Amino acid sequence: MLFRSLHTHTRARVSYNAHPDASDGTPPDAVFTDPASPLSDGVSKTILPARLPSFPDYRWPAFLQGIIDYGNSPAQRDILLLGAATVLGSTLNKLVSFVYGRKHKYPCLQVFVTAPPASGKGALTWVRRLAEPIHNALLDTYREKIKTYRMEKTKWDTLGKEKANTPEPEQPQLKMLLIAGDNTGTGIQENLMDSGGVGLICETEADTVSTAIGGDHGHWSDLLRKCFDHDRLAYNRRTNHEYRECNVTFLCVLLSGTPAQIKPLKIGRAHV
């Protein structure tokens, strides 16, 4: 799959019965139903959910440990760790790199956290706030620049014949860090190019992204695959003969959703 799916909880919930040992964030009454198969005795069996491994109990750097400690179960602490690493990686982007396979790699992760409803994955909402100060600062800077641009553009429009000797004010680019998942392919490319290839898509409901990708102007799953390898992006508009490109991309993706929300993403082995 395109996204490095990180299953921190059980994969499905079929029916409810008491579960004696649900300490990893799995709903205490979650069970699985094993359907009858030709090799069985023809009777469906109820089995307990498999215990997926969690990260060892390391002592992480203080600022990261403070985030992880808010988790009330091993699974939720894993969610906070992975989410924080993804969001913080988006803020580091091009500042940190290493060479792997003769290519430069950056701390730009694409993470999908899947879990049953009401199992704690909503904690990613709080992790997203780590990037909001930078995002808001970029927007504030843009608002100041666009205000100045409009004033200069108004003056330039009144110059009359002197326009020929005076360069037209250049409109500032809208730089941001947080990119909306409900977006078109061209929209995301523009967001990335305006921001030097840097961006973070963070959505707590995977349906937001799957709906956008499946829309008439969506189909940007290929863009995600390119950004995973930090490949260049480019597009050409015939209407105004505009060509834009971005040589290196630093896009991070952090999604969460239920197991049922994975399939609508329409990203399978053929896209690996």
What are these regions (language model features)?
Residues 1-2:
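Short, small-residue-biased leader/transition segments that mark boundaries at the very start
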Residues 14-16, 20-269:
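Phosphate-handling catalytic cores of nucleic-acid transaction enzymes
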Residues 8-12:
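Intrinsically disordered, low-complexity terminal segments enriched in Ser/Thr
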